[in-house]
Every structure is written in C-alpha cells, then in structure tokens.
Amino acid sequence: MMTGKSAPRRLSIFGSTGSIGQNTLNVVDHLGGRENFEISVLTGSGNVELLARQAKSSGARLAVTANDRHYESLKSELSGTGIAVASGKSGLMEAADRDVDWVMAAIVGTAGLAPTLAAARRGADIALANKECLVSAGDLFIAAIREGGGRLLPVDSEHNAIFQVLEENQRHAVERVILTASGGPFRTASLRDMADVTVETARAHPNWSMGLKISIDSASMFNKALEMIEALHLFSLRPEQIEVIFHPQSIIHSMVGYTDGSVLAQLGAPDMRTAIGYALSFPRRPNLPVERLDFAKLARLDFEAPDEVRFPALRLARLAMTRGGVQGAVLNGAKEVALEAFIEGRLSFLAMAEVTERVMDDLAGLPQAAGMDDVFAADREARQRAAELMTLAIAE
C-alpha cells in the first residue's frame, strides 16, 4: 500500500518581528521549513523591513502591519512578490480569519486580544505567548478555545514547563504548581536600594535577553504576577495552589506538586526555542539545537522565598485572583501606565506597585465581563485612573 507524505502544517505567526516571533521562524526553519510547514500569515508592527524580509524568506501568503501608517511602506517592500498586504485592526482580524492549523499568538499587549480570540474560535491550535489573553480575559479566552475545539499550548517557559510535567490523567491529584523566578537584578537588593532603581539597572536581567518593558516587568516581578494569573486559567487552579519561588540559575522552569508528596520539575537551559519547539511539535518532541545541561558543571541549584514587601506585585496577583472579575484587566492596565511613567522618569520603581494597587482598590466594584467590550472598558478605566492618580501626586 502506498503512503503519501502528509501535507505541510499551516501556520500563522502573530507578532513575527518580536523575539518570540523571530525564534518561532528559527525553529520552523530548523524543523524542515517549507517542506513541513506552510506560513500563511505574519504580522508585525513598526519594523516593516524585517516583516517584509520574513515574509519573502518564509513564503508567507499574507503580511500584516498593525499600524495603518506603515501600510504603504510594507506594500512597497513586498511589491511584485504576490504576498498580500493588510494593516490595522481590520488587517489583524483578516489574519485571524485565515484557515490554519496552528497560531503563534505573540502580539504584545491588548492589541493581541481580539485576533487571538478570533483564531481560537476558528479552531486553530493556539501557542500562547500573549499574556493579556489570560490575564485580562481568561474566562472568555478559555471559552473561545472550547468553542473552537483547538488546543491551548502555553509558550511562556514557566507555563510550558508545567504543561510538560502535568500528568493529564492525574489532574485531580495536583496539589500545587510552583512557578520559578530568577529574582531579577534586585533579588538581593534592600528596600532602600530599590527606591533608587533606574531604567538602566532594571533592564539588566541576569539570565534572559528580553525587550525593555518585559525586562522591567521581570525586575519588579509584575511579569511573574501576570504568570500567576495565567496559570490560574491555563490549568484550572485555585489561587492558593499557585506558588512562586526564586531560583537564580533559571534551570528549573517550574514544578508541579502532587497529593502523594511527589514534585515533578522541568529543567533545561534558558532558551525560548525549547518551549516554542514543544508547542509547535506537540505531542512529539522535536530535535532542537539548544544547549544540553551538563549536571556535573551545574554544581548547585538555589531556591529562596520571595519577599513580598520588596516585590508587592506577587501579592497584587493573589488579590486579583481572589477578587476575580475584571481585576486582572485592571491590574494589567494600571501597571502598563505606571511602567511607562517609570521609563519616562515620572514615577519611581517602587511606586509602580503603589499606583497599581490604588487603581485595583478603586475599581474593585466593576462587574464581571460579559464580553470583550467589558474587558476593554475595564482596561481603559484602569489606565485613566492610573494617569489621574499620578497627576494628583505630582500636583501635591
């Protein structure tokens, strides 16, 4: 009997010009490129030249810039290639409407919400790197995944680690999940020292190479706070089942504790291609050119309980999870405004959490989200309130 080669898997990469998107294309190339995969859509924002190069080299059918102002530039870059071009919110929704098997959802911020939910409802497997989908709209996003019938494959290294060691037929026996954090550049800093943190010192992550905003989020532990809320929705957990531990070597990416006292951990060198490759190849494991652990050279693995006085973002995550509703969206929206103010020199490092908590308290009475409009409204209110609080503080 003759057996034909299976058709290439159809992929869309939302946010292809970012770090996750570039690493995804790298993994696709390593796993056979066009022989095994068909790139349907690539989306980016301001880096038009890179987006155009990616579209040409991958053979993408559609290239989308999220910024309408860059439409003509992208169209000019891709003139004569046969690659379709679109832009703005409508372009992102056109991208989401493509019939594909797998979507890398790596658009940063709330801009990624609508297209990722739409792709989920169409039934594509979603490799999720966008935090806002679960932090701001967790219940709605999980419902969209169930409606479409696709699989939700986490790409954050911590959630991907849990996904790898979570025994599907033993979910009832999960006692806790333990998210690891390096502790960032201020793991051992005093509260007094943290009051004088600058943007340059905050962006210097000890183990991972990341963009400016996510580096600062990691330094303040807001990134870990968002990951706690994500884990709640991803794995159907209760807030009290989610723990955070500092692990400065970043070798253990997360752990799952079971009712019999066993703890299963996923270890590996800090390289995002491992999580991306696993999400792309699931349920199989790919052969990737990443560093192999040499346990003889590791020497030691250290762990410390985080100090929530110096890192209050972790406490705010628990507060948001306990309150529920749109508190995740409020936390994220307020934090984004505070982060911008810190980068611009208008707010201190420690004050980011103070502003965020004030906004969460002020908007604790907002109703449960019935749809995405409610999520976006909560996000807007949080951002407006955060801006007002900072204006009042400056005036005083």
UniProtKB/Swiss-Prot annotation:
EC class: oxidoreductase
Binding, 1-deoxy-D-xylulose 5-phosphate: K131, S157, E158, S182, H205, S218, N223, K224, E227
Q: Which GO terms describe its biological process?
A: isopentenyl diphosphate biosynthetic process, methylerythritol 4-phosphate pathway involved in terpenoid biosynthetic process
Q: InterPro entries this protein is in?
A: DXP_reductoisomerase, DXP_reductoisomerase_C, DXP_reductoisomerase_N, DXPR_C, DXPR_C_sf, NAD(P)-bd_dom_sf
Its pathway?
Isoprenoid biosynthesis; isopentenyl diphosphate biosynthesis via DXP pathway; isopentenyl diphosphate from 1-deoxy-D-xylulose 5-phosphate: step 1/6
Positions annotated to bind Mn(2+): D156, E158, E227
Enzyme Commission designation:
1.1.1.267
A GO MF term: 1-deoxy-D-xylulose-5-phosphate reductoisomerase activity
Cite the entry's keywords alphabetically. Answer: Isoprene biosynthesis, Manganese, Metal-binding, NADP, Oxidoreductase
The record's section on SUPFAM superfamilies has: 1-deoxy-D-xylulose-5-phosphate reductoisomerase, C-terminal domain, Glyceraldehyde-3-phosphate dehydrogenase-like, C-terminal domain, NAD(P)-binding Rossmann-fold domains
Instruction: Note whether NADP occurs among the keywords.
Output: yes
Stretches of the chain forming a coiled coil according to its record: none
Q: What reaction is this protein's catalytic activity?
A: 2-C-methyl-D-erythritol 4-phosphate + NADP(+) = 1-deoxy-D-xylulose 5-phosphate + NADPH + H(+)
Its required cofactor(s), as named, are: Mg(2+); Mn(2+)
Superkingdom of origin? Bacteria
Which PANTHER family does the protein's record reference?
1-DEOXY-D-XYLULOSE 5-PHOSPHATE REDUCTOISOMERASE (PTHR30525), 1-DEOXY-D-XYLULOSE 5-PHOSPHATE REDUCTOISOMERASE, CHLOROPLASTIC (PTHR30525:SF0)
Q: What does this protein do?
A: Catalyzes the NADPH-dependent rearrangement and reduction of 1-deoxy-D-xylulose-5-phosphate (DXP) to 2-C-methyl-D-erythritol 4-phosphate (MEP).
What family does the Swiss-Prot or TrEMBL record give for this protein? Belongs to the DXR family.
Its protein name is: 1-deoxy-D-xylulose 5-phosphate reductoisomerase
Q: Which organism is it from?
A: Rhizobium johnstonii (strain DSM 114642 / LMG 32736 / 3841)
